[in-house]
Amino acid sequence: MDVVGENEALQQFFEAQGANGTLGNPTLDTSLLEEFLGNDFDLGALQGQLPDTPPYSASDSCSPPQVKGACCPTLTPAARGTPAALLHSANAPGILPAHQSHSSSEMSNSGLPHRTFHNCYPDASHLMSPLDQSVSGGIGCSYHQQPLCHSPGVSLPPTKKRKCTQVLEDSGDCHVWTHHSRPMTGRSHSIEVQDLDSERQNMMLADQPSPALKWQPYRSVPWHSLLNSQYEKLPDVGYRVVTDKGFNFSPADEAFVCQKKNHFQITIHIQVWGSPKFVKTQMGLKPIEMFYLKPFGVKVEATNQIIAIEQSQADRSKKIFNPIKINLLADQVTKVTLGRLHFSETTANNMRKKGKPNPDQRYFMLVVGLYAANQDQFYLLSAHISERIIVRASNPGQFENDIDALWQRGQVPESVVCHGRVGINTDAPDEALVVCGNMKVMGTIMHPSDSRAKQNVQEVDTNEQLRRIAQMRIVEYDYKPEFASAMGINTAHQTGMIAQEVREILPRAVREVGDVTCENGETLENFLMVDKDQIFMENVGAVKQLCKLTNNLEERIEELEIWNRKLARLKRLSSSKSSASEASSISKFSRALSASSPKRTISKKNSKVSFSGKKQSCPNWVFQSLVITLIAVMAFCLKDQDRCTPSAPSSNLTSSQEPALPSTASPSAPNTTLATTLPSFQVPEITFCEILPCQQTYCCPIWGTRRGLSSPMQRQLEEQEPHQGPWAGRSTSFLAAEAQTNVDWRSDWIDTTISSIQIMEIQQIIDRRYCSRSLQCGSGNYYYHIPVNKYTPTNVKFSLEINTTEPLIVFQCKFTLGNMCFRSKIEAKGMESQQEVSQEMTQGYQHIWSLPVAPLFDSGYHFRVAAPDLADCSTDPYFAGKFFTDYFFYFYRHCV
């Protein structure tokens, strides 16, 4: 019967209690009735006291909306039609055709219409079309909105009492979307809603004892925009989905698990800004007739495959869930709860293998979408999708027993013990702990090292460890994407070693860990891993050996420095002794001459005239003065000759056996050069005929003069030569004799000889065929006489390439430019400035020198190949062949 006042309500209460036989029960709680009798009749006041719980299966399809001091308008049955299915439109994505269900079931047996609130559970059920074929009928929901009005005089059908939802006005749900009085654009509001949604979700996750199912926006098809009556675009709809119950998180599966027999429940919060009147489609603006909510499932591996959602009925049967029709008021939050829902299918590969999760496990995802309806078309406004879900036919709790049994609470507080092997990102750990991925350790990793636990302790050979480390190859590489993904490796580019190569050098540092399967199914049999601790200890031994070698080298360097100081001191002593011995020899020689002077009589038989030594001979002091003067002149000549003649072959371009470069030349005087003193046999000439035409002879009269030039290093050497004195040869011989009693110095120094010499432009090799016959070609000094073909033009470039087997330094100590060969003096003067050699030193393995050979009739060059920091152009020639090697090149134009 309809309740219209206190008497009718009281009568209805007593009739119900009397029929059930509970009126005399002392435990009967009549507080609700007393409060109702004490207040004015208000449907909203009565419903406000009901708890906020989802509807149960025996109740009506939808709870009446909570009203506070307002009335509810009556809806005619024609206005309450609910679509039975949502179908995709062929010409517009996201548009679903709707078919109105019959409204004959909306009338009760008493002839009165159903409750005039929006019906959230249509009775009609139809299959869905391709977009959401999982749509089901018979929906259970709690539907709330603010504010709603109730028309006076409306009668309510007698139904079972059920919980109602609370009014969202002044409730905790109102802070989800904060509406500003100022206009808001869709984009700014969407960002704000997402931020508030994430904060709300985080707060809920913090309050809940177990993880909650997470949701995110789902845009499988474009969302449509809403417009008001002024054709102004409204901000995006505020949309949030919360999972109430039905899903349990499984740590073993790393996913939420839902039992197909148990129902789940979700709550949707919807906020509309402004008053939406139109929806923007590809066909233009369409008026909005109604809003619909529709949940469905999709497969993770194929999101185009739809999983239908079912709902439990009062008789425990299940029916396909149909979209529910909702009414969204302007600038209000609408809360809709969908309960008693089930997935129509279970996920594939749910069976476990040996009590462990199946590696081929399949997953579902739940989608809840909001649509705007226009005639028979539905347009998607917003949708959210959940994370992956496993749907099993049995209780998921039974799968956790075998996992939990391995973990026990330890004896130490706040400790957990696992008796077995632990694998992270792997289902087959072969060690106590196997981690597939990166691992961060903020502390230290300790290893057992107590001597009481060790035996057979032996010292290792550090020299052998150094040899093994020197053989190991360090490489950069990239892991294959399929392997890195399977192993959880984020950084594919690494630096390290190859296990196969390490096994050949250090077998105990490589281990086989079995077969490894990549993400693409490829199996790596007997996968190898490297024990870097073993390699680290090898490095420690190698460093110790290097320290020993360094100490030995330092000791030898100190000894060499001591020997160097001793040699320098002996050299100075030898020079001073030689000067003293020379002075003493001169005095002795003068005394010997004076002692051997004749004091006898010279007679002639024919004339019989005799000269008496006492009477007719000159005084002794005259003879002594004459002898001393002669000896002084001889000594002066010897010194002058020593100054003019160099003490070593490195100071002259040629020796006395072969004439030097001419000092002067004139047109009337013929050219006298080394070319006239060459041996009779012929050596290969430097010719450019293979690359240039050889038609003209360049052996013209010589206009220029010989010019001897020296580099700055040579000038420094010449400044030091006067201080060496003429006794450098004696000092050198003394040092050579001293060195013969010691070890061979050459074994300690770098080889300073040249491996190859060639003219780069014509690839002409300069070898021992060009060695001088009259001068030595070895023992630290090499002399080369190189003839140049007479057809060689005067403007070609000569590049001398010197190659060494060690990283050495090549000094150009001296060069001598001989006679120029041009047709006129003007041409000769034009080339004067281009003949200067400016390069002083090169270093490395390859040394290239550009020499002005072509413009000159003859020229000479002195190069010194030295070890770094051991010699230069000023080094004593005695060390030739030890610290450096001298090379002399004499180029001349062969005009015979």
Swiss-Prot record:
Coiled-coil region list: 541-573
Entry's localization field: Membrane
Annotated stretches, region: Disordered: 648-672
Bias kind Polar residues: ranges: 648-658
GO function terms (MF aspect): DNA-binding transcription factor activity; sequence-specific DNA binding
Pfam families membership: MRF_C2, MYRF_ICA, NDT80_PhoG, Peptidase_S74
GO BP terms in the entry: positive regulation of DNA-templated transcription; protein autoprocessing
Membrane topology: Single-pass membrane protein
Entry keyword Plastid: no
DNA-binding region of this protein: 111-403
Domain of life: Eukaryota
A cellular component annotation (GO) from this entry: nucleus
Protein family per UniProt: Belongs to the MRF family.
Name of the protein in its database record: Myelin regulatory factor-like protein
